[in-house]
Structure formats: C-alpha cells, structure tokens
C-alpha cells in the first residue's frame, strides 16, 4: 500500500493512457498555445463529449478544478443570490467565494454536514434572496467522509430556491457508475438543480478539472463568458489525449476490477488498523 498519492487506482500508468499521450506529444507537440475562446484543440470536443455521456449532462473541461470554480461560480451566482457553504468545503471553493464577497453576495458558513442547520438557514434566507446555493464537497479531502447526498437532494426538492454545487474530485473514478464519483453513486440520477464539479488529477489519472451542468443554458454561459476560457491557455494535447483514453477505460468494464481492488485494500487497511489499535478518524469506505 502507498499512502502518498491521490492516484487511488494507479490508472495513470495504464498502457492505453501512456500510449495516447505519447502519440499526441509526437503529433501536436508539448503545448497548444491559444486561448480556447479563439481556437480550441480538437481533443477538447471528444473529451467533453465522452464526459457528457458518462454524466448524462453537459460537461466542460478546465485546466484545473480550482480554475473551474473561479471561472464558474462568479457566473452562476447572481448578486441577489445567497450562498451557504459547508465549513469543510475545499479551499478552492472558498477561494472562489472570496471573489463573490467583492460583489457583496451573502455568504453563510454552516457546521460540517449538519442538514438541520442548513435547513434553518434556508428558511431564514428564502424570502430575502432569489436563489440559495449550497457549496460543499462530495468526498471531503481532510477526513474522507461523504456529503449526505440523499438529504441534500430532498432539501433541493423541498425548497425550489436551493441549488447544489458540489466538488467531487476526491470521489472521481474509484466509485460510481463509470467512475462518475461518490455523488452519482449515492443517488443514481443527476438532480435538476445540481452543479457537479470534479476533475482528472486524482484517481482519473491525467490532469484538468471538469464542470458539469444541469442544462445547456448554464453550460453555454460559462463556456462563452468564463474568464478561465478567455484569459488562460489550454491543457497540453498529450494530457487531453490521455484524458480521452481514460474516459474510454471508465466507460468500459475495465474500470470495475480496478474499483473492486481498491475497495479490498481499503477494507484490509481498516481491518488491520482496528486489530493494531490504530486511531482511524472515520471508518468510511473511502481512500482519503
């Protein structure tokens, strides 16, 4: 067992991924030096098409998930909206909300995974703001615990103003149908008010971030107006080609034994830790 990497499946060494990256490196070079707002590598279209099939929703590949949050959230959240953020939400989400503070957007922070407190805040804010955004993680990066997705979906059904923005990069690949993550594994459908962000830098085995949207309107808004598209360079062709190869592995049965092998290792570790009297903060079936 190796505890120093977020490459939970070891898929970054898969021959198909390496071969795809090498081929693209030879054919397109080390970089494609242009903003996506002007000229886009053809690899993006194929990668985003595959991700859209995996998640069943429009998908947008970003240079990183941090840049994805900084690009997406300021466009999605309006000046008359309010944000309720889990106290353990990833720092990259918190960095994006700092930009919204400059617009005087209302931001409340609530205790970790406390749905009772969240609902009380919704009741207080719902008559004062147009939309309410809940920001949190799918799998939290510090303790490896999960968001209560079923409860969040229930609240989104109960309160029309509530929208969910979840970062599930630590859940990507090792769980969920086609490796789509913990959120999609917890509830096997994409809520109409869910904005699910994830990425390829952990168990997926390549690099970059991913934003998914409930409909084409939000997708086009971020793709057309997002600063991360207009003022940032593209991912290298080799990374995009590797991402396409990894997508194809995820959409095949090949991903299943990799997930099962990791689950067996997690169970083994938890069992041995208990036998040895080691303190484990949370006994989740999580690699974090």
Predicted features along the sequence, with ranges:
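Substrate-binding/gating loop at the entrance of the active-site cleft, primarily
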Residues: 64, 85-101
